[in-house]
């Protein structure tokens, strides 16, 4: 049985080949192996968004935020998906959460 990383790599290859449906299938296979594989959820969210399947993409992106709440990129990604879906207020909300996280990290690191 392939590992989550191997299935993830297969999904990335599908994206590179323009096969987004194949990528979605491979990301889902990776997540069946490891349900907490944040990179798999991230890739799945992006592929789904590119397919216009925004509700599913947002749900996957929310899973990334839950798994990696201190990673600013996860907030940026979900904000981008919401904007692409036409939900600008929700996009701004997620972007603001990401900015607050960044500011907190800067304060923690002693940066002005």
What residues fall within each predicted segment?
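Terminal, low-structured helical/coil segments at or just beyond the last alpha-helical repeat
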Residues: 1-4, 80-112
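Structural signature of tandem alpha-helical TPR/SEL1-like repeats
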Residues: 3, 16-28, 51-63, 85-97
């Amino acid at each position: 049985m392939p590992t989550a990383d191997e299935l993830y790599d297969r999904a990335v290859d599908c994206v590179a080949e323009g096969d987004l449906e194949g990528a979605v299938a491979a990301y889902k296979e990776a997540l069946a192996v490891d349900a907490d594989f944040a990179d798999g959820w991230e890739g799945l969210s992006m592929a789904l968004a590119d397919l216009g399947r925004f509700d599913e993409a947002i749900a996957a992106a929310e899973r990334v935020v839950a798994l990696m709440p201190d990673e600013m990129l996860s907030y940026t990604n979900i904000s981008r998906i919401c904007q692409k879906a036409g939900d600008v207020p929700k996009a701004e909300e997620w972007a603001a959460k990401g900015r607050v996280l960044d500011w907190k990290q800067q304060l923690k690191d002693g940066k002005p």
